[in-house]
Amino acid sequence: MSGFTPASSSVVVTLTTALALAPTAAFAVDYLSADEAAKLMFPQADRFEPRTLAFDAEQLQRLQAAGVSPRSARWQVRVAQRDGATLGYVVVDDVIGKFELITYAVGIGSDGAVRQVEVLSYRESHGHEIRLPAWRRQFVGKDASAPLRVGEDIANISGATLSCSHVTEGIKRIVTVIDLARHAGSLA
C-alpha cells in the first residue's frame, strides 16, 4: 500500500488551497529603516531634527492647485543638519502598489531637488524592480516644477506599472509639499 488515503489527499488539497490564497504580504521585504535611509541620504549630517508640517486650508488648496492630493494636513519631516546648517529633508511615505503598501523615503536637498529615493519596505509579489538604482536615479535633480509623470520624464517598468505610477505620484506630492513649506518658511 502506498500510504496515500482519502484523508491525506484532503490534507494536500487543503494545503494547496491555503497556499494559493495566502496574502501577497508573504513577499514583504524590509530593506532599510527610516533612520538608515536618512543617514544614507545625508551621510554628512550630524543631526536629524524631526519636524511636523501643519498646513492650513489655503496651503492645502495650493497643493491641490499644483496637481497633487495632499492626503493629510500634517507631514513628518526629518531636517538633516550639520553644525546647525540645513542640508536637506527626508520624508518617509507609504503608497499602495497593486495590493500592498510600499514604504519609501525621499531625500530632498535644501534647494528643493530630489537627492535620493530609497525603498524601505516592499510588500508586493511583483514589481520589486522599482528598487533598481537606475529607476530610482530618474528622480535625482527633480523638483516641484518637474512633471514627474510615468511615461513623460519617468520611465515605466513592465510588470510594475502601478508601483511605478504610485511611487512617482508620491514623490511628486513630497517635493511639492517641501517646496510649499520652504517658501512659507515652515522649514527655516
Regions found by a protein language model. Name each.
Residues 2-14:
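Bacterial N-terminal signal peptides that target proteins for export
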Residues 26-157, 161-165, 169-188:
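Flexible, solvent-exposed loop/hinge segments and secondary-structure transition points
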